[in-house]
From Swiss-Prot:
Molecular functions per Gene Ontology: GTP binding; GTPase activity; mitochondrial ribosome binding
Keywords, ordered alphabetically: GTP-binding, Hydrolase, Membrane, Mitochondrion, Mitochondrion inner membrane, Nucleotide-binding, Protein biosynthesis, Transit peptide
Job of this protein: Promotes mitochondrial protein synthesis. May act as a fidelity factor of the translation reaction, by catalyzing a one-codon backward translocation of tRNAs on improperly translocated ribosomes. Binds to mitochondrial ribosomes in a GTP-dependent manner.
Entry's Gene Ontology cellular component terms: mitochondrial inner membrane; mitochondrial matrix
Protein's gene: GUF1
Transit peptide boundaries: 1-26
Residues annotated to bind GTP: 48-55, 115-119, 169-172
Pfam families to which the protein is assigned, alphabetical: EFG_C, GTP_EFTU, GTP_EFTU_D2, LepA_C
GO biological process per UniProt: positive regulation of translation; translation
Native species: Lachancea thermotolerans (strain ATCC 56472 / CBS 6340 / NRRL Y-8284)
Membrane topology category: Peripheral membrane protein
Annotated SUPFAM superfamilies: EF-G C-terminal domain-like, P-loop containing nucleoside triphosphate hydrolases
Family classification: Belongs to the TRAFAC class translation factor GTPase superfamily. Classic translation factor GTPase family. LepA subfamily.
Annotated protein name in UniProt: Translation factor GUF1, mitochondrial
Length: 640
């Protein structure tokens, strides 16, 4: 029954927004596509901070190029995941082909738009998307100005030699401050004010008149050669319950047709193309894909793990004359959680669901693990805490699966006295005190450089927040007359994933923005904090943290967990322990059973005998018995 529900959820998501094209419509699209030369191709992306209007601008571009019709039903067209629509953020980069007739030149153009995420946790999606583009729209909210992730994504696009078109969005808002936004773009990115385009993605102001012509004029066409042997860069992949593994590819050189035999450069496995086509905005089957185009192919791939992002796909027999493309650097997971099925009997089906979802999000690392408290599960690695939260939501929405997720932890490095190093991602693997004293030279934790932008009036509160999270100030910049401040702090990643972004939004009244990048490991005084029930450690609840946090967190843990443990027939002692030292203790008194209820009030000796027997029985139960903790208690505590 659960498997049927899972398939229903997947199919409903897949077909909810599918555009059905007749054979006549498809033929017309293919004829138009064939008549456009590669010099009239424009592949571009949109660079922006979260909530600056990327998805809305994408909708207007699709609308003005005839891909979709205007209307409320066509909102966030490229945000195809249910979790994207609920949260109002882009998570997966999506591509769409558009046709645009330029009346100035009387020429037809083929545009490939890649709508990318803005949040730092999905930077790997952004990086892969830029590899298929010749340019990008640098989008800035007229009311908020340049934000932290605008800066980070700008430098990423700039480093990949993309032609950037500065665009100020939301000019129709009463709170819009266009001169301030222009000044920030000019001073922060050194882009000429004359090149800035002002638009309203919501109303469509200047999108058709100014922005589309600028894309044609300023963004260069792809540089591939149609007569060279076919090679394509594998940009993304996903699992379709009807087609199997689907690959999103950028055709760098040559032509590929339905029925062609292709080979993977990384695995050496050969496949026959069952179907291929363009995204318009959903899959539209075509006869072939040419140089410079971005589209999908269905290779009949049997194993999900064979779809390796950054792989080069080429024709069978042409391996010796086809140069392999530079792939992508594998994203490095920096936040790890333990994941366990809410219902232990569904481990096998949940394992299949997680494996399929990982195919669509290759930045997730996956490893089996088991817990004494929660049973069989997985150790999952993510790019950030939002990434982990989104993965859990997608699993629930797309597959109907329920997970228990432990508190996030970051990778720590152990340096031994003999020169060896070990990275641990599970608190259960943290060395005990005796090993630390004899064989360990140092313990290190990951640090990041956090870039924070905020209005000057909240500067004091934000500096205090950073210092309370062991931040070290490296730079403070006042952005001219705009009233904005840019802060740079070195900070332990462990503090950043502990809802630092939520705390920043709170102290800055929602105006602060955050971006960060990894800067390596530093020696640190870190210890493992355990929750102990009647002398037995609960492995799923252990966490590694800095010594300065231990007492505060330990007291909070013990007090909080007491709320979720039901009273037993014997006394339950809850302790928070670090380095074999008890930090905090809470006691749940034994549930009393009235063994005297049936006795006569005058039978004193019998009463004493039964009470002594009850006391001895409870003592024995405490020494040999296991405390019964239900799954709901763990879930409630982990949601704290």
């Amino acid at each position: 029954m659960r498997r049927l529900r899972s398939l229903y959820l997947q199919s409903s998501i897949c077909f909810r927004r599918f555009n059905h094209y007749s054979a006549k419509d498809t033929e017309a699209l293919q004829r138009r596509l064939e008549q456009i030369p590669i010099e009239n191709y424009r592949n571009f992306s949109i660079v922006a901070h979260v909530d600056h209007g990327k998805s809305t601008l994408s909708d207007r571009l699709l609308e003005f190029t005839g891909v979709i019709k205007a209307g409320d039903s066509n909102r966030q067209v490229l945000d195809k995941l249910e979790v994207e629509r609920e949260r109002g953020i882009t998570i997966k980069a999506q591509t769409c082909t558009m046709f645009y007739y330029d009346k100035r030149r009387n020429k037809d153009y083929l545009l490939h738009l890649v709508d990318t995420p803005g949040h730092v946790d999905f930077r790997a999606e952004v990086s892969r998307s830029y590899a298929s583009c010749g340019g990008a729209l640098l989008l800035v909210d007229a009311s908020q100005g340049v934000q932290a992730q605008t800066v980070a994504n700008f430098y990423l696009a700039y480093s990949m030699n993309l032609k950037l078109i500065p665009v100020i969005n939301k000019i129709d808002l009463d709170s819009a401050n266009i001169p301030q936004a222009e000044a920030q773009i000019e001073s922060t990115f050194e882009l000429p004010r004359a090149e800035i385009i002002r638009v309203s993605a919501k109303t469509g102001i200047n999108v058709k008149e100014d922005l589309l012509p600028a894309i044609i004029d300023r963004i260069p066409p792809p540089t591939g050669v149609g007569k060279k042997p076919f090679r394509a860069l594998l940009v993304d992949s996903w699992y379709d319950s009807y087609l199997g593994v689907v690959l999103l590819v950028n055709i760098v050189d040559g032509v590929v047709k339905k029925g062609d035999r292709v080979v993977s450069a990384q695995t050496g496995k050969k496949y026959e193309i069952k179907e291929l086509g363009i995204m318009y905005p959903d899959k539209v089957s075509m006869g072939c894909l040419r140089t410079g185009q971005v589209g999908y192919i269905v290779p009949g791939m049997k194993e999900s793990k064979d779809a390796k992002i950054g792989d080069t796909i080429m024709h069978v027999g042409k391996e010796s004359v086809t140069e392999v493309l530079d792939g992508f650097e594998d994203p490095k997971p920096m936040v790890f959680v333990g994941a366990f099925p809410a219902d232990g009997t569904e481990f096998k089906s949940l394992d299949e669901d997680i494996t399929r979802l990982v195919l669509n999000d290759r930045s997730v690392s996956l490893q089996r693990e088991s817990s004494n408290a929660l049973g069989q599960g997985w150790r999952l690695g993510f790019l950030g805490s939002l990434h982990a939260s989104v993965f859990k939501d997608r699993l629930e929405k797309e597959y109907g699966s329920k997970l228990i997720i432990t508190q996030p932890t970051v990778p720590y490095v152990i340096k031994f006295t003999n020169g060896e190093e070990k990275i641990i991602t599970n608190p259960d693997d943290f060395p005990d005190l005796s090993l630390r004293k004899t064989r360990i030279d140092s313990l290190q934790e990951p640090y990041v450089e956090a870039i924070i932008t905020l209005p000057q009036e909240y500067l004091g509160a934000v500096i205090k927040l950073c210092e309370n999270n062991r931040g070290i100030q490296k730079e403070i910049t006042y952005l001219n007359v705009t009233g904005q401040v840019l802060l740079k702090y070195e900070m332990p990643l462990a503090h950043l994933v502990d809802d630092f972004f939520g705390k920043l939004k709170s102290v800055s009244r929602g105006y602060g923005s955050l971006d960060y990048e990894d800067i390596g490991y530093k020696a640190s005084d870190i210890v493992k904090l355990e929750l102990v029930l009647n002398g037995k450690s609960v492995d799923a609840l252990a966490q590694v943290m800095h010594r300065s946090q231990v007492e505060r967190v330990g007291r909070k843990w013990a007090k909080k967990f007491k709320e979720y443990v039901k009273s037993q027939l014997y006394e339950v002692v809850i302790q928070a322990r670090a380095n074999n030292k008890v930090i905090a203790r809470e006691t749940i008194k034994a549930r009393r059973k009235d063994v005297l209820a049936k006795l006569h009030a005058s039978d004193v000796s019998r009463r004493k005998k039964l009470l002594v027997k009850q006391k001895e029985g409870k003592k024995q139960m405490k020494s040999v018995g296991n405390i019964q903790i239900n799954q709901e208690a763990y879930q409630a505590f982990l949601r704290r």
